[in-house]
Amino acid sequence: MAHRHASSGEIVELKALGDALEQHVTHALIKSAQLELVRLVLPAGKALREHRVAGEITVLCVEGVIDIRVQGSDRRLAAGQLIHLGAGEPHAVRAVTSASALLTICLVAP
């Protein structure tokens, strides 16, 4: 099922999914020429191989626990914690527990 992107000025619900997390999938919430916001939904143990994004990013853990591997070590994020990565910074992601997060991507590279 395709998810609709929110329009400018529209309120987006980002509360924890709780027991319903396993029924949800990763999807873009907002996408514009300069910015993309994605709700990451990661079952426990799910990993994203090392990759990089041209622009800067932030990852805000909404629920659960996520490891972000950057600069050779893991940074553990719990609910309410955020990490910023510079443009082109190689990183990998792994869900320690079932988790959801808000990924913000600046699509305009420096």
Where are the language model's segments positioned?
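A short, N-terminal "cap"/entry segment at the start of jelly-roll beta-barrel domains
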Residues: 1-34, 69
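Conserved short histidine dyad/triad with adjacent acidic residue
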Residues: 23, 36-53
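Short, conserved beta-strand element in jelly-roll/cupin
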Residues: 41, 52-67
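A cytosolic small-molecule/anion-sensing beta-strand core signal
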Residues: 62-63, 78-79, 97
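Short acidic-glycine-tyrosine-enriched beta hairpin
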Residues: 72-87
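Ligand-binding loop in jelly-roll beta-barrel domains
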Residues: 87-110
